[in-house]
C-alpha cells in the first residue's frame, strides 16, 4: 500500500469533481444535468476481486458525493448521473479484448446523460443502462 498514491487518487477521483461542481453550481439552470464518471470497481456489493484499494476507495467516495448532491439538488430540478463507463479497452485495462471501445462507451454514457430525470437522478448506472449495486 502506498498512502501517498491513495491520497492522490482520492483527490483526483473524488474531491476534485465535488469541489469543481460546488464551484459551478450557481451556473446550473433548472433541468441541468451533472454527470460523474465513477466505476463499478467502487461498488461494495459487486467487489469480488479485491485489490486496487486507492482506486476503489476513491470511486466509492465519488459515488457517495454524487448521491448526496443528487438529494441536495433535486429540489432545484438539477439531475445527477452516477455513471460507470463499462469495461473499456484502454491502457488502464490492459487493452482487454473483453472491453468495449471508447466510442461505444461514450455513446452509452451520452444516452444515460440524455435520459437523466427526477426518477433516475442519483442512481448508479452502467453505460449500457443497467442499474448497478452499491
Language-model features, listed with the residues they occupy:
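Catalytic loop of short-chain dehydrogenase/reductase
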Residues: 1-15, 19, 25-74
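Ser/Thr-centric signal marking residues that sit
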Residues: 21, 58, 90, 121
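Alpha-helix C-terminal capping segments
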Residues: 24-29, 92-96
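Rossmann-like NAD(H)/NADP(H) cofactor-binding core
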Residues: 35, 76-81, 123
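Short, well-ordered beta-to-alpha junction loops that form the rim of enzyme active sites
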Residues: 37-39, 85-86, 129
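Short beta-loop-alpha junction of Rossmann-like oxidoreductase domains
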Residues: 43-46, 84-96
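C-terminal helical subdomain
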Residues: 82-83, 94-134
